[in-house]
Amino acid sequence: MRLNVVVAVSENWGIGKGGGLPWKIKKDMEFFKTVTTKAHPGLKNAVVMGRVTWESIPESFKPLKDRINIVVSSTLSHAPSFVQVVPSLNAAIDLLYNEEFSSIVDEVFIIGGYRLYKEALKQSIYPVRIYCTHILSEVDCDTYFPKVDWDKLKKVDLPDIPADTFTENGFTFKFCVYDVPSEQFI
């Protein structure tokens, strides 16, 4: 199993503001959906997120369609039946290895927030791949991605990930994929 981190991050490491995204970039949302839903036939991907990330998703998009939704929270008191709630990232991984899920899960995607990103990057049991939308400017944020040295990561060129730079709604951005070396530390 590999842990895949999906993140849009500004040059000042920002990922969120006021419980939501600090930008509206349709192309990034399309990238997120494509990356997290593309699975082998007969399988589904799992998206693992913290409570605040779950709560930031508009009701009309809950659950994230065609994916197994797992929320990591010790305080979420009630959740719809279509969502699995677990107390930790390790519990989420254990759940995905149980009989109910192990035969239907293709890839696991960590989609936020900070604590889960940090745990995924810090652990050394599973290989980590980062699918990143680099927002090529500093953005006013109150939630941040753990700092990594992008130059120490192995850039991965995938045929379905565009190498171009795009501009939308005043934000210039590009998509990149990185493999995190096992000796990477956060």
Swiss-Prot record:
Top enzyme category: oxidoreductase
PROSITE patterns registered for this protein in UniProt: DHFR_1, DHFR_2
Any Gene Ontology biological process: folic acid metabolic process
UniProt-listed SUPFAM superfamilies: Dihydrofolate reductase-like
Residue ranges of every copy of the DHFR domain listed in the record: 2-180
EC number: 1.5.1.3
Chain residues that bind NADP(+): 8, 14-20, 51-53, 73-75, 112-119
UniProt xrefs under Pfam families: DHFR_1
Annotated catalysed reactions: (6S)-5,6,7,8-tetrahydrofolate + NADP(+) = 7,8-dihydrofolate + NADPH + H(+)
InterPro entries named in the record: DHFR, DHFR-like_dom_sf, DHFR_CS, DHFR_dom
Domain of life: Eukaryota
One cellular component (GO) term of this entry: mitochondrion
UniProt keyword list: NADP, One-carbon metabolism, Oxidoreductase
GO molecular function: dihydrofolate reductase activity; NADP binding
Residues at which substrate binds: 28-33, 67
Listed pathway(s): Cofactor biosynthesis; tetrahydrofolate biosynthesis; 5,6,7,8-tetrahydrofolate from 7,8-dihydrofolate: step 1/1
Subunit description: Monomer.
Family as reported in the entry's similarity comment: Belongs to the dihydrofolate reductase family.
Function: Key enzyme in folate metabolism. Contributes to the de novo mitochondrial thymidylate biosynthesis pathway. Catalyzes an essential reaction for de novo glycine and purine synthesis, and for DNA precursor synthesis.
Name of this protein: Dihydrofolate reductase
Organism: Schistosoma mansoni
